[in-house]
């Protein structure tokens, strides 16, 4: 992908506006997870090191535009950045008509979603952001799939628009996995429903050699192959779709599964009741009417791990079982360790996937972990991300 990169620009004495994703959880004024802030720090530090006057902007939560509330303020983030950077980071609330700032200084602009027109990508608002700077740096991959005034709009109107290091790294990794993948490529797509991952499955079926499915998605594929799935989550109206995907790409199906008796499961306390349920390994042809499939079986996990061993590119989106409960997590554990041991390039994304990576402590063995959420999925689906498209356009 061809786009301007912040790291290639001379930022000395330039006014630089960096759009980061600093949307962190805040409880009683305290930041409860600083992962996104830690990820953004190197970009800010790199701009300061070049002698730029740095303005940072972000959204936080989902405020009503034009109605700022203290609990949705970026004040705790400004305090965090001051400590982390070792210099004062002022929070500016009134900045749209101009910001007084000197090279080597950094300020944080208050929650962009307090501004009327932010989410609708209002052109006048976007032009005001653009007028603040000599260089606009888009570094928030997690919001790149939304055309908003502080993302797509500011990039469109700024004198110079570039991708920050975080965004550039993400796009390079996604390009490597999806646009120029080294073959053989294997994708793991798991989740409760085929319907929510249909575009992902369809897109990946065009580029990968094997498509491993898990969770409720696998149940629909098992049903399409004529197996009884008992009381398992399954979308019968998408059986023909599953058949069409399986006709296009190799979809290795589970040969054994881990089930529980559905009559023992309290759906109001799903995970709690699963912790007490008996986990039984069964061949797929032996699934009974009351069985609920909650993981792939040991033989299947071993077979899938063998497939992953020979892959040169692996894309992982979704755990293959209810890994939050240990007796239904062995399949996900086996696959996560196989991905970690693979010599191929691996990329993983999606909230549940990140939780599994944390649980099985394989983060440092995955080639690239995307924090993009919805943006990651839309990129995998082959959709155009507005804030990326404008950077390509302006390159």
UniProtKB/Swiss-Prot annotation:
It catalyses: (2R)-3-phosphoglycerate + ATP = (2R)-3-phospho-glyceroyl phosphate + ADP. It holds the Pfam family PGK. The keyword Cytoplasm applies. InterPro entries: Phosphoglycerate_kinase, Phosphoglycerate_kinase_CS, Phosphoglycerate_kinase_N, Phosphoglycerate_kinase_sf. The keyword Cytoplasm applies. GO terms for molecular function: ADP binding; ATP binding; phosphoglycerate kinase activity. This is Phosphoglycerate kinase. Monomer. It comes from the Bacteria. Belongs to the phosphoglycerate kinase family. It is found in: Cytoplasm. Pathway: Carbohydrate degradation; glycolysis; pyruvate from D-glyceraldehyde 3-phosphate: step 2/5. The lineage of its organism: Bacteria, Pseudomonadati, Pseudomonadota, Gammaproteobacteria, Moraxellales. It comes from Acinetobacter baylyi (strain ATCC 33305 / BD413 / ADP1). The gene is pgk. GO terms for cellular component: cytosol.
